[in-house]
Amino acid sequence: MDYNVKDFGALGDGVSDDRVAIQAAIDAAHAAGGGTVYLPPGEYRVSAAGEPSDGCLTLRDNVYLAGAGMGQTVIKLVDGSAQKITGIVRSPFGEETSNFGMRDLTLDGNRANTVDKVDGWFNGYAPGQPGADRNVTIERVEVREMSGYGFDPHEQTINLVLRDSVAHHNGLDGFVADYQIGGTFENNVAYANDRHGFNIVTSTNDFVMRNNVAYGNGGNGLVVQRGSENLAHPENILIDGGSYYDNGLEGVLVKMSNNVTVQNADIHGNGSSGVRVYGAQGVQILGNQIHDNAKTAVAPEVLLQSYDDTLGVSGNYYTTLNTRVEGNTITGSANSTYGVQERNDGTDFSSLVGNTINGVQEAAHLYGPNSTVSGTVSAPPQGTDGNDVLIGSDVGEQISGGAGDDRLDGGAGDDLLDGGAGRDRLTGGLGADTFRFALREDSHRSPLGTFSDLILDFDPSQDKIDVSALGFIGLGNGYAGTLAVSLSADGLRTYLKSYDADAQGRSFELALDGNHAATLSAGNIVFAAATPVDPSAEAQPIVGSDLDDQLHGTLLGEEISGGGGADQLYGYGGGDLLDGGAGRDRLTGGEGADTFRFALREDSHRSAAGTFSDLILDFDPTQDKLDVSALGFTGLGNGYAGTLAVSVSDDGTRTYLKSYETDAEGRSFEVSLQGNHAAALSADNILFATPVPVDPGVEGTPVVGSDLDDELHGTLGSEQILGGGGADQLYGYAGNDLLDGGAGRDKLSGGEGADTFRFALREDSHRSPLGTFGDRILDFDPSQDRIDVSALGFSGLGNGYAGSLAVSVSDDGTRTYLKSYEADAQGLSFEVALEGDHAAALSADNIVFAATDAAAAGELGVIGASGQPDDPAV
């Protein structure tokens, strides 16, 4: 018989409290021996009935609650409820209840407008007592916005069936099976719950999970576990089919349980391992698709380990034993270490049978003396677009890294290693290995930085480097299709380099650990077929075109003009005049007293678009000259006020003449000289223009950087210095300057005066899971300088949360940090470093914060973070 709640006074208008009316209908059905209590479409508000164990609505024997469908019939907790409610709908506490349930409706916990823990569905007799609820059926029910659990059938329940239902956005677990006997969860979905999707706990046994889905939950997708009390472990659990993906921790966790089977499931994209067996016995993992897990932590796809509870409630050590992993397809992500891994903690008697394992460092890594692997197929590891760690086997194979900064290890055998794009580290291992480079972008340097691979164990007696696809024809000076060999200053690293750049400014470069300069030859480098060029065959190639020319002089002195393009000019004998013209040219004077002329700033410069400076390969300061008179430079200096600055590269192999002043097109003059000529350059070998005195006291204009790694200088006046993108260096000098490094890891020096260091975007100075990209202030003076973070919304100093910034000092006391521990949607947390210990001096007097509104400040709650994500539902 049906009992319509509206016949008992329920309104379903979303405003009135209908609890008493609905309960009256339930009681009437119970008094008549049973029936269905029907709620027509509408929103029925309910309040707490009294004690937490009273819930809101209490079902009785043979009574079923039914609505018009999920989302059509909604039972919602009233606004302002401020007490614990163990079940908006529940069975009576301490009474054995049978043949009852709920279907076709939604329970809404209204967590945004209520206080204290509220659960959606709850049933069970009483904890630790021998009674039980029986024959419970829940179908097509949605539970949402509970501050506690969604569905929480509790101890003990015999023969519960919960199917075709949904739990989402609840504060703890979506579905709990606490001491269930002989029940079934089928075709349910749990998503966006703060803790686990499904939690099978507290002595549950003979239980079936079939075709359920859990995704986007904060903890595990599905966990089977004993819980925090010393009770009998869950046993005889079947998990058949379904999907468990994109959860914060494991896809499936089996902890302190016995005889659990996980089969035919799709488990992928989870934060840690796909499946973790933790202090359990007799677990079977059969025929699953386990792939692309370890998204937020380095982990194996399947982890088998023991659980130490010697300091816990049982005092026992639970060894993982007799796990069978059979017929699974296991594919790793960039962070996946192994297909299946045992921990070296006593775990034993594991059997791996007939699995297909790909894309991991190693297919299986077992420690148990009685653990075995048979029939497992593992393809050579292949990389992704992420930062992969790929380890080969004991046979020869081809390992390709793909994009990303990869680590490749060939293991034994004659392997072929191809790191692909990115800055890769390559280890051939035992055997005669080949390191292949198919594209210039795979290992190169450019104006954007160095992206060269490093070979860690090159053996010149048997290994080979294959650069044939790049067109290099032999060893030489790094030009005209040759590769130059050079050593680091300490002799611990060898480099193979080309000095010819492609259209994107990339020059091939490869590093080898160790000193191999004397042993590298055509015997261990695979070159392309050489096409010899006779330089004497070009009689008078003196004037170039707008293309990339190679122009050769003779034994006489002549003028060689490159024109447009990235040209190569060779003077050979005689006192030559070389003028590369526009483009990034390479100039070799040869013998004789040569002059290298620069008539236009565009001939050799850098700008926001990149570096287009010429390189002089054989400048002899005792006889050669640089002619910059047409550009108006008047002498050597700091690169300002018409002077040229001299600097040397970090490795001492290249000297630069630079102006830091730009023309209307943003171009600054720069020319490079091979070798260290810093001490030898002077007015004797540089032809300057007649100097024009400059008043250094004139206040400068704003200095604006590019998206490259800029070095920007102020004047003696006050100005804004804006870095833009790139890892910039900003120098204010005197005056009250404003320095804004922009994006990139910048170094800021205000100099004299009361300077302001501004941070307008969180990306300008931050840390993230990808690394630390914080700016560093080199000379902060707390007595007069300021740090402006007002645009970022920070309101004061504090613990780094709730809009505050925390102050900390490095262990050695040489650096102070201002940090926020709150990340934005991209995972960026603000951080800036100050040289020196300023912890005691930092305050609102020298930090510009955003305006605060105390009345609008709300309390930030922490949801679902007990610190013990594997704890049971209690």
UniProtKB/Swiss-Prot annotation:
Matching InterPro entries: Beta_helix (IPR039448), Carb-bd_sugar_hydrolysis-dom (IPR006633), Hemolysin-typ_Ca-bd_CS (IPR018511), Hemolysn_Ca-bd (IPR001343), PbH1 (IPR006626), Pectin_lyas_fold (IPR012334), Pectin_lyase_fold/virulence (IPR011050), Peptidase_M10B_C (IPR013858)
Reactions catalysed according to its record: [(1->4)-beta-D-mannuronosyl](n) = [alginate](n)
Enzyme class name: isomerase
Cellular compartments per GO CC: extracellular space
Keyword Secreted assigned: yes
GO function terms (MF aspect): calcium ion binding; isomerase activity
Keywords noted in UniProt: Alginate biosynthesis, Calcium, Isomerase, Repeat, Secreted
Pathway given in the UniProt record: Glycan biosynthesis; alginate biosynthesis
Cofactor(s) of this protein: Ca(2+)
Other notes: Each enzyme of this family of C5 epimerases introduces its own characteristic sequence distribution of G-blocks in their substrates, explaining the extensive sequence variability of alginates. These alginates of varying composition have different physical properties and are necessary at different stages of the bacterium life cycle.
Family label: Belongs to the D-mannuronate C5-epimerase family.
Function: Converts beta-D-mannuronic acid (M) to alpha-L-guluronic acid (G), producing a polymer with gel-forming capacity, required for the formation of the cyst coat.
Protein known as: Mannuronan C5-epimerase AlgE6
Source organism (scientific name): Azotobacter vinelandii
Taxonomy of the source species: Bacteria, Pseudomonadati, Pseudomonadota, Gammaproteobacteria, Pseudomonadales
